[in-house]
Amino acid sequence: MVKAVCVLKGTTGEVTGTVYFEQESDSAPVKLTGQIIGLAPGLHGFHVHAFGDNTNXXXXXXXXXXXXXXTHAGPTDKDRHVGDLGNVAKIDITDKMLTLNGPLSIIGRTMVIHEKADDLGKGGNDESLKTGNAGGRMA
């Protein structure tokens, strides 16, 4: 079993949270649990970004971790970015595309909470296919 933890902190300190990850084996889905506090009411996009460096207010986090040139989508869609995890405040997700092992592991990458709801790639424009129109980064 592989376990990991991500501590989220917003740029102003108001948004904070902790996400816990568990994967029973290389082929098992990843279980995510946790909670984010300090968010405005409503849904907020939640993504794994490609790089782990968030020292420049998350600007260096780049786009969501993607595989095989897929576009942005929802967590239950077959063709999606690996890091597309939908909308959160309280986290209880089991995901078959994430892994904590091997070259596609999300360990060492940045988790980002966005200011708006994620439209899951169904917003009908180019930005929707890249980011889900989830807006700025809160943490």
Curated annotation (Swiss-Prot):
InterPro entries associated with the record: SOD-like_Cu/Zn_dom_sf (IPR036423), SOD_Cu/Zn_/chaperone (IPR024134), SOD_Cu/Zn_BS (IPR018152), SOD_Cu_Zn_dom (IPR001424)
Binding site for Cu cation: 47, 49, 114
Annotated keywords: Antioxidant, Copper, Cytoplasm, Lipoprotein, Metal-binding, Nucleus, Oxidoreductase, Palmitate, Zinc
Cofactor: Cu cation; Zn(2+)
Keyword field contains Nucleus: yes
Organism superkingdom: Eukaryota
Basic and acidic residues: compositionally biased ranges: 118-129
Record-listed E.C. numbers: 1.15.1.1
Membrane spanning residue stretches: none
Chain sites annotated for binding Zn(2+): 72, 81, 84
One GO MF term attached to the UniProt entry: superoxide dismutase activity
Locations listed in the record: Cytoplasm; Nucleus
Purpose: Destroys radicals which are normally produced within the cells and which are toxic to biological systems.
Subunit details: Homodimer.
Family indicated by similarity: Belongs to the Cu-Zn superoxide dismutase family.
Protein name, as recorded: Superoxide dismutase [Cu-Zn]
